[in-house]
């Protein structure tokens, strides 16, 4: 554990049951934690930083992360957290249950423009799992890889911690592999429950839609991560709600 991380955890303990808040700042001497005062009217439920604290942190160096805590709460960013994180364009570090959970500032899961290898179906799957607290590796994928003898999903899923489950056992957070104009599975979607999926197909924005007969016919298999648990979908749901509210 770094000195910065130790300082973050100590500050969170001192502030509890109120939420702590602060910044990780990169200075010429290295990264350091810059604690702030939570000026929220409901500090046990929310945090708010003063503009003066933000300015003082910026004067110390480059802000590389915003930090706050969820005392007695959940280890995922809330709906409000996600909305504010995207606006801040910063990584957010969340202290919960004595640990620091670090979240990259990924775009909202719905409403993304498609760009193969940058914001595509795998990016959406990877970012959704990141918000749920599970890290998936990124990897190079050339255009139309499925037309050039590659089978990237089936060749990599087990090695990254997923295992196949029966379609009849689908749970929110499971990954649907589909054959989209291909004889091999070349498309991933997140099953959201209630016959709904979240995915990103070419020439469309990422979105939720019904898991209709059309997509059921295209489905190759269903996969689940060994570290997945039902409550992890909270991190995904909070982002979807934040994007809906923002729109």
Predicted regions and their residues:
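Surface-exposed patches in mature extracellular/periplasmic domains of secreted proteins
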Residues: 136-141
């Amino acid at each position: 554990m770094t000195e910065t991380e130790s300082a973050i955890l100590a500050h969170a303990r001192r502030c509890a049951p109120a939420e702590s808040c602060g910044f990780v700042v990169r200075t010429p001497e290295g990264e350091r934690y810059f604690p702030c005062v939570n000026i929220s009217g409901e500090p046990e439920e929310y945090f708010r930083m003063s503009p003066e604290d933000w300015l003082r942190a910026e004067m110390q160096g480059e802000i590389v992360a915003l930090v706050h805590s969820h005392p007695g709460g959940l280890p995922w960013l809330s709906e409000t957290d996600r909305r504010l994180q995207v606006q801040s364009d910063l990584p957010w570090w969340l202290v919960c249950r004595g640990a620091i959970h670090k979240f990259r500032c990924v775009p909202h899961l719905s409403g993304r423009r498609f760009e193969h290898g940058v914001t595509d179906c795998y990016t959406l799957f990877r970012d959704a799992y990141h918000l749920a607290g599970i890290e998936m590796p990124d990897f190079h994928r050339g255009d139309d890889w499925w037309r050039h003898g590659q089978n990237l999903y089936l060749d990599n899923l087990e090695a990254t911690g997923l295992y196949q489950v029966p379609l009849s056992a689908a749970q929110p957070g499971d990954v649907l592999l589909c054959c989209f104009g291909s004889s091999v599975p070349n498309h991933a979607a997140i099953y959201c429950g209630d016959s709904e999926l979240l995915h990103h197909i070419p020439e469309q924005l990422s979105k939720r839609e019904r898991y209709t007969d059309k997509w059921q016919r295209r489905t190759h298999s269903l996969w689940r991560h060994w570290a997945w648990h039902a409550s992890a979908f909270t991190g995904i749901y909070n982002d979807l709600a934040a994007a809906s509210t923002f729109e």
